[in-house]
Amino acid sequence: MGVYSVLLAIVVVLVGYLLLKWRRALHYWQNLDIPCEEPHILMGSLTGVQTSRSFSAIWMDYYNKFRGTGPFAGFYWFQRPGILVLDISLAKLILIKEFNKFTDRGFYHNTEDDPLSGQLFLLDGQKWKSMRSKLSYTFTSGKMKYMFPTVVKVGHEFIEVFGQAMEKSPIVEVRDILARFTTDVIGTCAFGIECSSLKDPEAEFRVMGRRAIFEQRHGPIGIAFINSFQNLARRLHMKITLEEAEHFFLRIVRETVAFREKNNIRRNDFMDQLIDLKNSPLTKSESGESVNLTIEEMAAQAFVFFGAGFETSSTTMGFALYELAQHQDIQDRVRKECQEVIGKYNGEITYESMKDMVYLDQVISETLRLYTVLPVLNRECLEDYEVPGHPKYVIKKGMPVLIPCGAMHRDEKLYANPNTFNPDNFSPERVKERDSVEWLPFGDGPRNCIGMRFGQMQARSGLALLINRFKFSVCEQTTIPIVYSKKTFLISSETGIFLKVERV
């Protein structure tokens, strides 16, 4: 009995110690008198996420509540004290000027048990730096020009399928068909595979891409645990990727690589770049260790390129059409520009013609301001950092750093009438006057979005093809204002985007 009493006492003391430590962690900012909200015991400052609030709403509400109080507000990333940036000058320091102190994103990854988590977006340290350097060659202007005819080829099929949908019903849900377009583009450009999702909405590539983006392997409690105790989660062999998506993308990459190497096929695309990395050393660590890219690492890069590329571009195009349907004068101006430019290039959409569609670019940039697909940028502090001019505000080593770019894009101090769709915000004159960190849909600095050029190319070509042939208007099924999905980290419409479509 005495032994059991001692063991019980030890357990009680241990639990009490852990609860005390837990409580102290959740009062970190209050004890320093830094503005913050009272955190939830499990979710921290993410109370209601995926149930009653979208991620986007959380960043927006927090930013609007505390802006003007200091360079940042205290924020609890689940159980971890972190910061939410409130000042654009601090964002610039973190992303550009002091980048060496904030190079990592701090997201969970477990390459041993969850190989697709070893993607560029999640990698840290020297391995991220080496991988980024190698992959950058895939997204040069020359590579984009080479891929452009493929984009246009898929685009013509897209227009045909879109027209068929309109003939069946003048009310078209545009989000899904746009995602099928970008799925086929990326599948062809990255894998050299005909995905056929335009013809078949239930094609395997489309289904797996959709599931990888919108389905979670864990519920809110599991996500909170993984993000709060990353090292323990790795010891417990926890994964974040859906099992089916993992098997699918590993299989596709293995089969594609084997076929190309056996038949000596080169397509000068993303997969070729990965094959080159597989067959040449990649510096992996600070010690200078060099290794070849494995099939699993190749699959991870292909996975993020596919998943991020099809969803972000299709979402941007969908929201652009949503706004153009509400602003017929702007839509008419874009159409006039597209028709004039296409006429100038003998009725063809070419890589060079895209550069002449200046107002279309402004529409896309303004859409990305109002509907920032990734509404927050994540970083992790690598060493204690005192905010210049604010000795009270210190970011400790290991703290999560959140830059709520979606909320900043709707700040009236940065953009007049910030909730109004106005492509003139991105006229050449205004862009020259604006600091680059005041527009962050692709991030900024050395860790900006590596696929930015590809995403913009998809959006430009897809919208130019559509607007040249179709007129878009709102209808009874159009949700105004838009309601965001609560289930995904990226912004997307909860109910789809329904628009009335007519041929021009």
Curated annotation (Swiss-Prot):
Superkingdom is Eukaryota
Extract the PROSITE patterns matched here: CYTOCHROME_P450 (PS00086)
Cofactor(s) required for function per UniProt: heme
Q: What class of enzyme is it?
A: oxidoreductase
Which annotated residues bind heme?
C449
> Any S-S bridges, and between which cysteines?
none
Membrane topology label? Peripheral membrane protein
Signal peptide range in chain numbering: none
Q: Which family does it belong to?
A: Belongs to the cytochrome P450 family.
PANTHER family, per the entry? CYTOCHROME P450 (PTHR24292), CYTOCHROME P450 6A16, ISOFORM B-RELATED (PTHR24292:SF100)
Q: What is the protein named?
A: Cytochrome P450 6a9
